[in-house]
Each structure stands twice: as structure tokens, then as C-alpha cells.
Amino acid sequence: MKDKKQKITVIFGIICAVIIGVCLVIQFVIKKEDKKLQKEKEKLEILTIKTESGIEIETEYYSFNNSKFYLKIPKSFKQLDYETIAKKYNGNVPNIVFSNEETTINVAVSLTDNEMSNTQIKSFKETMENLLKDNSEIISSDLYEVNKYNIGKIKLISNAQDTSIYNNMIFFSYNDKLVIVTFNCTTELQKEWQSVGDFIIDSLFFKE
């Protein structure tokens, strides 16, 4: 009888220890998730970024084509009309382009009709890298998630007619269609504006 009581006590102790352990793990996960949400909230609220030389750039959120994805766009940038976009870009013309006065710094968004699922983004990124590396210098590439959307990213230097262009490009699936967003500037402006480009590209978020 005594042994039986001891066994029950041991089992009860183990159960209590397991319950306490589970509670601690749950608390840790909740705190971690709260910190993550707080960090994301703070990121969304920051609307200013400085260039390398310290010039403060003020941005505002822009929703593209009434879609439920948003990017921070510098307030000083102007949206180009179709004729200007067509002259500036050869081949696949973006739907929307925001530029500085000199049109040397741009944020371009292509809302394509190409079928693309969320799960295809990884293979599309790899295909793009293979295509681009022949005529461009690939700086880096990445694959990550934003609000459960897979995002492919490629940074590269491409050649234009009389200069070289720094590109920070992301692509993702929205409504099962491919969307491409690119921040670009001439390589002469890359050092000054690269952090601003990162700020713009990394500001992407989706609202359900």
C-alpha cells in the first residue's frame, strides 16, 4: 500500500512537472509572438528614412491598383504617365512607376497577367537568377515570407545604354498572378540611396 502511494505521488509529481513545463513553453511562445507583432507594428509606423548623406526622406503607404498590398513610397516621388514609362523602359513596361524629378531613382510595379502560385515563387526566383546572371552582376538573392506570401528577392547591377543600374527586385504571387516590384537607381546614386531602396522594398505588407 505504501509503495502504491509512493508511485501515485511520483506519477502526480511527473504530471505536475509536465503541466508546468507546457505552461512555460506556451508563455515563452506567446511572449515571442507578442514581441514579433510589436516589432512589425513599429516597422509599419516608421515612415521616414535617411539617405547615406543624412537627407531625410518622408514616405507614405500606397495601395497598388486597389490591391490589398502596400508599399512605402517617398512623398517627393511623382507617378509617371504611361508615355514617359514606355520611353524609359524597354520590353516589359511596368504598370506603375514612381520617380524623383530627374527620373534617376525609381520604384516600379508590374502587375502581370502571368499565372503564378505562391508555391512557385522559389522556382521562379531560381529561374530568374539563371537568366539574369548572364548579362548582370547578381549581388544577392533571398526567399522569405510576408504575411504568409512567399517573396523572392534579387539584388543586381544591370547595364543600360550609357550607365549601370542598381536594382533591388522582389516578386510574389497575388491573386495567382505574378507581381514584380523594383527599386532602381544609377550606380552613381547607389551608395546614397541603397538604404532607402531597402526601406521601400522591405515595407511590403498585405492586408486581408
Annotate each predicted stretch with a short phrase.
Residues 2, 86, 125-173:
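Signature of long, low-cysteine stretches enriched in small and polar/charged residues
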Residues 2-93, 184-208:
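N-terminal targeting sequences that direct proteins away from the cytosol to non-cytosolic compartments
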Residues 60, 94-96, 150-154:
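Short beta-strand micro-motifs in enzyme catalytic cores
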Residues 66-70, 102-104, 160-164, 176:
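Glycine-centered tight beta-turn/hairpin loop motif at sheet-sheet or coil-to-beta transitions
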Residues 67-69, 73, 94, 150, ...:
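Envelope-exposed proteins and targeting segments
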Residues 74, 121, 125, 129, ...:
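Extracytoplasmic/secreted envelope proteins and their assembly/folding machinery
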Residues 94-123:
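A short acidic-to-branched-hydrophobic micro-motif
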Residues 147-208:
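Short, well-structured beta-strand
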